[in-house]
Amino acid sequence: MTASPAGKPAGGRERAAQVRTLFSEIAHRYDMLNHVLSLNIDRRWRRRAVAALGWERAPGGSYLDACAGTLDLALELAARPGFRGRVAAADFALPMLVRGLPKIGRAPVAPVCGDAQRLPFAGESFAGATVGFGVRNLSNLQAGFEELHRVLRPEGRLVILEFAVPPGRLLRAAYMAYFNHVLPLVGRLVSGHPWAYAYLPASVRGFPAPEELADLLRRAGFAEAVWFPVSGGIAAIHVAEKARRPGAAPRPGR
């Protein structure tokens, strides 16, 4: 795997190998760095993402968390009062999943080592799916969305939590200064990895804006795709829904 000193993301298969190696190498410090560098605000974002999933429509259903990392988002869903289902937590970086294993306890979460662009599940397997800070790392974004659409049942909902660039001039300037300078420096010092946290701002700068991402979701087959900003627009939550089967009655709770 190769990477520039600035952590510029590669493309295609090289990008996939780069991302897998990167997250495998920082798995041991990933949780701590996430919480510290986000000032713990990432926990609130995950709660809002789970709330947007609408799991109450099928509380005993099967759910997918793709690009699951160390399992925080999967466990957030599994811990909701009234949730009686199961969560398959898929990630192609095995060390990240291993790092999350001690958190599981009795939670109904099953880690699966698998690529979000080639998920090891049959079509229409899940009542809903989540992706937290993961779609930005896919080597083929459209293929990933089409694969998530494939494994969702009709009326299944996909919720994506991802970084964004805030629209306000002052907040954007402060955010980009932190993202481009403070975060890579602190991340490098704490993780010991020479370029992992330089990759993050580079990947965000090259990522589609929320409006473009919603359009890509529609092209992948989702009937509805909306988004809303969180924390002033430094992140966004996208909600997309697979179409109902023709002639089928609406799912209860809509």
How would you label these PLM feature ranges?
Residues 223, 229-254:
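Core SAM-dependent methyltransferase catalytic element
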Residues 59, 83, 152-157:
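Short glycine-dipeptide loop
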Residues 30, 129-130:
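Hydrophobic beta-strand segment of the Class I
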Residues 117-128:
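A short acidic, Gly/Pro-enriched loop at the edge of an enzyme's catalytic core
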